[in-house]
């Protein structure tokens, strides 16, 4: 296990500052004037005579040059006043104390430093509304809902026309998102706003079929790698490149302390798989897990501010034999843990049996469910089998139970699925899970490319996002091979941002095409700097261009090294356009008529005889 250094020595330079060619801008609320919703604005060259392009921005204060970043104090808890003003929560008088097992019994130099800055810990007051779902059902528009509405509109005006030429497969995407529309979607369970009342640093966002497709990035330590510094750095790095949520999947020691540092410095929702930490508390012996340990872990993480829990309550005892003839069996870590527990005790999954108790704990802090697909296929050969869909149907049943308790729900999905089987996954989820948001890992469309699974999965992610999946969990090049580093995180995030945007474009999401059109015009007009800055990864685009044309003068040239100055199709197209524009209005028709007359004079023969 790594030696844990003091945070000031270990943290290094957290990536901060604006992205190239961009600036941080904010839009205030109308119902709640104090809210400030962030965007990334990219200005284009004055010759374009175009307004700046507004891009969705989950990077938080780290890209605001005026923000004071202090990792040891955490981000400003700007959402906390909204929670207090509602008057529906109370301070926890005696918060749960940190126990040795919370950090895997790490001691001395191996124990990660605690996050020591003090903060209040809240819990829902008895008989009061607590969750965004409960507020929505009561007809109350919260500050979080207006925040989401502003964010989704990307600063478009309500009466501004938009292009809607996609296929949305029955979704109900509006031309303009209002706070009332957000409320309605949350009330129906078609969207969630994952926002624990103890995550005051959060910038609210929505996950739902009728909103922009979101992406999640996974970080977390393991039994052999990573420190607090590594994980905070990966958090900031992932959000800088566009991660909308981050899951802390830590499985080694120091899980509690590392998670505290992550949440206190996170502007995006944080998700976890509580069974991982519960397993550490019983020394890694799945058979020793029990409700008391798991319940304690839920409360611990809820008080810290985790926004959504992956709970594998659908891995039921009767379903386990259905996996026996699979090529890759049970590949979900959480699913395999619960399957082992069920078989060892020959009992029903205690997460399933105690599900209503879990709901009551999560409701008290407004923690959302991410109902885990513990029986997801781990190979294309196993896709869409009875084990997978039996669990999915159970998750649909549990969704109704969670809604009854006022808890927000999304459903996790596969996995490894060949392209021709992807649509069936979306159809089955909509049918059995009552339109609760779908959250999928890819899916990977082929199993032949270790080291390139970010690509094999992005193919499936773009497709299932188009069909209706609300959030895509990224896959990095290290999938199946090792723990990703920061370069892998960047690659995974950017790959999935383009998959999500491709899905938005295909769905006909209003505003999606504006970004593409802006960069297309820049490309046609040889505005190289605009091309770089409007891209998902300006640094890489600029570096690739400069490998062969490094001089500054080349950034105004009307060609690149692919075609050179004589064969550039866009340059030739511009010349054709200019030539056509200079011709008399009837000259083209006149020329065509002359050629037609000549054709008839020659006997209207397609092939002329030669002497």
Curated annotation (Swiss-Prot):
Residues holding substrate: 218, 247, 276, 312, 332-334, 373-376, 412, 439
GO molecular function, one term: zinc ion binding
Subunit structure: Homodimer.
Pfam families for the chain: ThiC-associated, ThiC_Rad_SAM
Domain of life according to the entry: Bacteria
Name of the protein described by the UniProt record: Phosphomethylpyrimidine synthase
Transmembrane feature ranges: none
Cofactor: binding details: Binds 1 [4Fe-4S] cluster per subunit. The cluster is coordinated with 3 cysteines and an exchangeable S-adenosyl-L-methionine.
NCBIfam families listed in its UniProt record: PRK09284.1 (NF006763), PRK13352.1 (NF009895), thiC (TIGR00190)
Catalysed reaction equations from the record: 5-amino-1-(5-phospho-beta-D-ribosyl)imidazole + S-adenosyl-L-methionine = 4-amino-2-methyl-5-(phosphooxymethyl)pyrimidine + CO + 5'-deoxyadenosine + formate + L-methionine + 3 H(+)
Function: Catalyzes the synthesis of the hydroxymethylpyrimidine phosphate (HMP-P) moiety of thiamine from aminoimidazole ribotide (AIR) in a radical S-adenosyl-L-methionine (SAM)-dependent reaction.
Keywords: 4Fe-4S, Iron, Iron-sulfur, Lyase, Metal-binding, S-adenosyl-L-methionine, Thiamine biosynthesis, Zinc
Pathway: Cofactor biosynthesis; thiamine diphosphate biosynthesis
EC number annotated for this UniProt entry: 4.1.99.17
InterPro entries (UniProt xref): ThiC, ThiC-associated_dom, ThiC/Bza_core_dom, ThiC/BzaA/B
UniProt xrefs under PANTHER family: PHOSPHOMETHYLPYRIMIDINE SYNTHASE, CHLOROPLASTIC, THIAMINE BIOSYNTHESIS PROTEIN THIC
Cellular component, GO annotation: cytosol
Gene assigned in the entry: thiC
Top enzyme category: lyase
